[in-house]
Swiss-Prot record:
The keyword Membrane does not apply. GO terms for molecular function: ATP binding; magnesium ion binding; methionine adenosyltransferase activity. One of its GO terms (cellular component) is cytoplasm. The lineage of its organism: Bacteria, Pseudomonadati, Pseudomonadota, Acidithiobacillia, Acidithiobacillales. This is S-adenosylmethionine synthase. Pfam families: S-AdoMet_synt_C, S-AdoMet_synt_M, S-AdoMet_synt_N. GO terms for biological process: one-carbon metabolic process; S-adenosylmethionine biosynthetic process. It catalyses: L-methionine + ATP + H2O = S-adenosyl-L-methionine + phosphate + diphosphate. It comes from the Bacteria. Pathway: Amino-acid biosynthesis; S-adenosyl-L-methionine biosynthesis; S-adenosyl-L-methionine from L-methionine: step 1/1. InterPro entries: ADOMET_SYNTHASE_CS, S-AdoMet_synt_C, S-AdoMet_synt_central, S-AdoMet_synt_N, S-AdoMet_synthetase, S-AdoMet_synthetase_sfam. PROSITE patterns: ADOMET_SYNTHASE_1, ADOMET_SYNTHASE_2. Residues 100-110 are annotated as: Flexible loop.
Amino acid sequence: MSKSHLFTSESVSEGHPDKVADQISDAILDAILAQDPRGRVAAETLITTGLIVLAGEITTTAVVDYADVARQTVRRIGYNSSDMGFDWASCAVVQTLDKQSPDIAQGVDEGAGLDLDQGAGDQGLMFGFACDETDVLMPTPIYFAHRLTERQAMVRKDGRLPWLRPDAKSQVTVRYEDDRPVAIDTVVLSTQHAPDISHADLVEAVREEIIKPVLPPEMIHKDTKYLINPTGRFVIGGPVGDCGLTGRKIIVDTYGGQGSHGGGAFSGKDPSKVDRSSSYAGRYVAKNIVAAGLARRCEVQVAYAIGVSQPVSLMVDTFGTGVIDDDRIAALVQEHFDLRPKGIIQMLDLLRPIYAKTAAYGHFGREEPEFTWERTDKAAVLRDAAGLR
């Protein structure tokens, strides 16, 4: 008898206030890296009615107009009118930015501190995950949740649904049988809108223009449930509806609740922060393990101590799907991947202004040319090393 269960993941649009904050923080990071690839950045953003607050620690030689970077990010997202409740041109921007602590810097700088190699920017544990449910080796629920919010932004910006506004959320519930995705059980999509669109017209348009083009027909069945703006009205949204903060959508950013999470956010952090760079490396490792056919499902944990270059631990878990022992796969990882902070930065070419694009619709499962952690260029090497033919 087959074993059945439901699993749900959510996504939020680029206009969700927490994602606006993430995008501002990563736009600041990109502006610095474009001039100073070795800049140290921990940029935090708060956004609320009529106000953006920029805080954090930044050490750089770059000259950046942080307020303008924040405003232009909000403009690109689409909050361009007081009628929406937030206007990029008239909002206030408050800055309180300090330099990185020299005590932290000496542990990170190569040639300084007790470990003369580049050390980790903090202690912590990070996870990477991959599975063979989709072509991009991501879990099905989060993959389609992201595609729905991406589609909402597309049809808003290209004028097909001009009454849409930037804030939106999606949620996809998938039915699994014997741990394989077989059907979509429930779709939730809530989108901000202009006040003059009726609920009935909105529901029809969202279903036809956003949901149907995204979800595969073979996963839809007669009992699939669609909950579109289930409160009935979503006019007040964005930073007016909720205060946004950097780093509050860490499950949306990763695997939608499948796999584990070490707790560290990504946006606004330069790659010397292992919260970000090691999570990207973990995805790179896990994806190559699955792409190599060593497992159908794989989670990698790596942990660090501040100022120390070598990881303090490495764990591989294939959830019983591995074709060789997990310990053997972990040994192959140590042999073929350099998981020191400096090694990760070089391996994935992370000292580039590539991060604003990561800050909405997921850091993983998007095969953009800049997303080097999505490559599967180690798969053949791993397969050969494992003795698979």
